[in-house]
């Protein structure tokens, strides 16, 4: 569903082409769908599979015909009823009913020893009964909408089982969920489409939307508060009658008003009274990890002693190559740390927002045979420094405190300003296929990130010159 004003703009500007980012997302979705379809069982003596093709109407009719014929597995299904339609990656028969199948590039479930979630290997979908797996479901609204609409389409033919199948970044596991859990949210989302807004409001997705060039001038003419506080972040001020950035400034509400003024004046960062430089050490390294979706970490980049050291694999993740690469990185890091301590010197490894690194340190250790206590000892030690926590304590900014926001203020510049996390996902796919230019771009991007971390801490240690007080 997403931004409802996009539907208005789509009618106004039907010829505006899709952005590169949206085309890349579509390519990734197609690749995910193809990967799952290749795993699903083929037709056999007692199992019939049909792969639908053709235009939208042809697939809608073929979906109904295949269900009427009792086909066990139907891929590329489509329903259209009552003003809505839904594209499904498949339908799988269960007794006299069907389950809608969706393939998502989200992480749809997380391992949890205290939870259970029914699931089945993807290649056994439609052939084996689900088993309780130690996972906890993760909710993503758009996935829930598709499952609910798929269930409603099945209800029109009295073939709804009440359950659906979702396959996420782990393409080899299909999880079974209760589709009724998504009905209420989907009904609310559909209801909002009956009363479309007459003006835009900035949300996170605007950055990659093809209609932003038309919405931005409208928002600027209105001085809309969402320019500064996108999405629901400005709701509490709207409820107080404050709808513009200038109105928030004049309200004199302390930090929010000061940051609104900084936004209006183009000031990216202000120094808090609690400013303090980060911990420093005799031996220092900066670390940044790159992962591909939820499949694994393929690059551990390190800046040490004025040089960049990438520990990288371009092979598919989850196998020996990823394990060998992580072992090489972990051995290098622990040996450097141990040697430093043996000399009686201090050691510090820095990263910017450690959540991702901590996750993949733990996950890699679990999958590739490194003792968890080694990882936990490092993560919880003073030698592992999350620079973002120092930045958060020391600064406030109207655009947040991401690495891409803070590092330029500290004097750092990336080789490619517009190469971001989504671009890296696209480049990773090309790199695995052997594209040397994509590999070089990923290494350059990662090198820029570790250098940015280094630059920020050096700048903070010098007192963050040039930054005004909050």
Tell what function each PLM region has:
Residues 1-97, 107, 431:
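Metal-dependent nuclease catalytic cores that hydrolyze phosphodiester bonds in DNA/RNA
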Residues 16-21, 225-281:
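N-terminal accessory regions of nucleic-acid-interacting proteins
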Residues 54-58, 250-255, 417-430:
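Short linear loop/turn motifs
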Residues 56, 70-113, 119-180, 311-425:
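Conserved DEDDh/DEDDy metal-dependent 3′-5′ exonuclease domain
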Residues 62-72, 274-285:
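Structured nucleic-acid-interacting core domains from mobile-element enzymes and related host factors
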Residues 149-156, 160-222, 406-470:
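Acidic, Mg2+-coordinating catalytic module of metal-dependent nucleases/exonucleases
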Residues 281, 289-328:
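Metal-dependent catalytic core segments for phosphate chemistry
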